[in-house]
Amino acid sequence: MTLRPCLLALALSLPPLPLLAADAPAKYRSAQEIIDAAPASDWHTPAAENTLYMDLEGGRVIIELAPQFAPEHASNIRTMAREHFWDGLSIYRSQDNFVVQFGDADADDAAKAKSMGSAKPHLPAEFQRPLQGLAFTALPDRDGWAPRTGFVGDFPVGSDGKNAWLAHCYGALGAGRNNDEDSSVGAELYVVTGQSPRQLDRNITLVGRVLKGMELLSTIKRGPDPMGFYEDPAQRTPIKAITLASELPEAQRVKLQVLRTDSKTFADAVEARRNRVDGFYKRAAGHIDLCNIPLPVRIR
């Protein structure tokens, strides 16, 4: 006599067992939890020759240049930083929900304008560049301003499959110009401090982004309507200095690291934001906008 047929019949008659723990859905981790667990290899230090320290009375703003998108402007900005062009100048514009702008407030007055030293007085417009040759990490979601969006290095980028361009996200650094598209030289710069004005993409040369210190710029007192330029020079925010990190001894450089946008950690953090299902969120969006993805930065 054998028990096998009886055991088989009994097994078939029982309700299915719950999924094994290994098959259960993974517990949701927030983007911050994912970032906190990132291995050291997922972080990198921006190149010192592309890092600017903007020192204000209230603290330091750290900026990263993007020479892969605007090489001529980045080179000119480096020249002006080495020659201390911005030292003693000011933030002379703060427009609500738009930008702060800084440089020489008297630049249009030849009698008062500060010399740009050995910087080039004319540069080509650098609105976009070929996508080929860039390591483009694409996002899965549709965008109203570009057929494709994603990241190249530390920068949010739009693309049409042929060309790529930097996006006007919060913290983007752009080179102010007049009506002529090639009228920017990098002496007058602005930082986006409001909702992302993506209509400016491919209309102005973007040269980098703020990595740290946005709170020092976004809280500057707004200038008068309609454009935010201060009428009273006393209302401007003085710039103590803008310095290239590469001009300082290594011991004096800020030990800043940025999460690699081509890392699994970054991809997982983006997905956690796209489909947030924690105790507060009742419906996952299943979508994320390019400019709603913060770039994780840390000081070591």
Placement of each model-derived feature along the sequence:
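Bacterial N-terminal signal peptides
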Residues: 6-16
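Positively charged n-region of N-terminal signal peptides that target proteins for export
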Residues: 1-5
